[in-house]
Amino acid sequence: MDELYSVRMRAAQGGPHENGGHHISGAERIVTLNQVGFIAQSLAERALHHSKGTADFINITVDLIPSETITYIDCLKVKEHTANTVTEAHQLAVKLLQGTDISESAIRNSIFLLKSLVSSMRGAMLVDAISGERLDAGNRGVRVSHMDSFDSDKLGDNEHMREALVLASKVQSAEGIVGELCWSDDPDYTIGYVACNGVYHRIPNMKEIGSNLGGRVFFVKPNIDLEGVIEYLEKEPVLVQW
């Protein structure tokens, strides 16, 4: 098997994220050596031509991934839903997520947290699935990384959905995570999703068109090893099989 490399991009406007720059874009791939140059260029182009603005800070990182460290997981099943308004979409999200592992109050508090953002986070919030308490600190959140898919052409040209499915599949494979709530910070993209019980539920109208605020919430079981979960999400190489 050819050696694989992780190619990761993060971009901001107004300087680096660490210095208060406004997050524009982030993306990554796991590819063979002969694809690294092309993928790095395409990620840079994405940062320079984004609906949120033109990045003036772009960081691209390339790392070799030893094949023995890669975890292979199955992709979540996909279910499409309809919703005509943001209120209807959020009510559906509550209905789909609520169950023995996630309380209604935790879901509603998480929707409130996302709606209360004044700027988009690079990473996701970690929320106790029962109490609804936010467990992570600061504005960075947990940045899921080191992931990609096989046979991504099966989804056609829908890059938004491919990337979201890969990320959601990795998140749901983490021990102790029982659900996810997400809508994009892309002002032109209003489709969001919830993921739980092995299913990726795609929901339209999760936010108003033109809004550049979005984010993710990962619902975690009480009293889990948070450091272990974060280590897996941020550093464990994962390839998703369709």
UniProtKB/Swiss-Prot annotation:
Any single biological process term in GO: biotin biosynthetic process
Record's signal peptide: none
Keywords assigned by UniProt, alphabetized: ATP-binding, Biotin biosynthesis, Ligase, Magnesium, Nucleotide-binding
UniProt GO MF annotations: 6-carboxyhexanoate-CoA ligase activity; ATP binding; magnesium ion binding
Pfam families: BioW
Pathway: Metabolic intermediate metabolism; pimeloyl-CoA biosynthesis; pimeloyl-CoA from pimelate: step 1/1
EC number: 6.2.1.14
Cofactor annotation: Mg(2+)
Keyword Membrane belongs to the record: no
Reaction catalyzed: heptanedioate + ATP + CoA = 6-carboxyhexanoyl-CoA + AMP + diphosphate
Subunit organization: Homodimer.
Entry similarity comment: Belongs to the BioW family.
Function per UniProt: Catalyzes the transformation of pimelate into pimeloyl-CoA with concomitant hydrolysis of ATP to AMP.
Protein name as annotated: 6-carboxyhexanoate--CoA ligase
Upper lineage: Bacteria, Bacillati, Bacillota, Negativicutes, Veillonellales
